[in-house]
Amino acid sequence: SVGHTIARKGLPEFLELAVRMPDVRFLWFGWTDPCLIPQEVRQAMEQAPENVTFAGFVDRETLREAYCGADVFAFMSHEETEGIVVLEALACGIPTVVRDIPVYAGWLRDGKNVYKADSTEAFRQRVTGLLDGALPDLTEAGRRVAEERSMAAMGEQLREIYRRMDILPAARPAHPQRNQARA
């Protein structure tokens, strides 16, 4: 998973999932100032099973390589504003399991472009099904979602809204003409 090491991101459930799946390697990328981590979360991290690695903060290229090398992306966050890391995982073609929360309604569809889960046991079942090949591969549909929600696609949608509202500013030349006369 990727995110701050806090309970809201689903860290306790992530660790419980690792306990239930001891033969699977779990990686968590992200960092939070230890002063901001509640004691119970800090203790859970200190007592994490051996199959869990906290990689901390990594550069963009290392994170991309981690996404591309993953067999499954399990994002157990309880609350999100958009789910950027989900889009990153989908763009990298990783089978993805997310918590079934309202922010994903309408664009992430269970069994169509991702798998959704509402409990640690449901996550275990979906992750196991993906690793064993028992669940259908949704990576191409997931990639399409990432493309549809790319910055370029979102910018074009915003431009269309402005155009329909007749508030699109007049186009400016790409390279404004410069005054050739110099003093």
Could you describe each region identified by the protein language model?
Residues V2, R25-E40, F54-G56:
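Glycosyltransferase donor-sugar binding loop
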Residues H4-R20, L36:
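A conserved mid-protein helix/loop that constitutes part of the nucleotide-sugar donor-binding site
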Residues F57-V58, E65-A70:
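Short alpha-helical donor nucleotide-sugar binding micro-motif in glycosyltransferases
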Residues H78:
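Aromatic "clamp/platform" in nucleotide-sugar-dependent glycosyltransferases that forms part
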Residues P95-V98:
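Short hydrophobic beta-strand element within catalytic cores of glycosyltransferases
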Residues D110-E121, G129-A134:
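Conserved acidic donor-binding segment of nucleotide-sugar-dependent glycosyltransferases
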Residues P136-R163, I167:
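A charged, aromatic-enriched C-terminal amphipathic alpha-helix characteristic of glycosyltransferases
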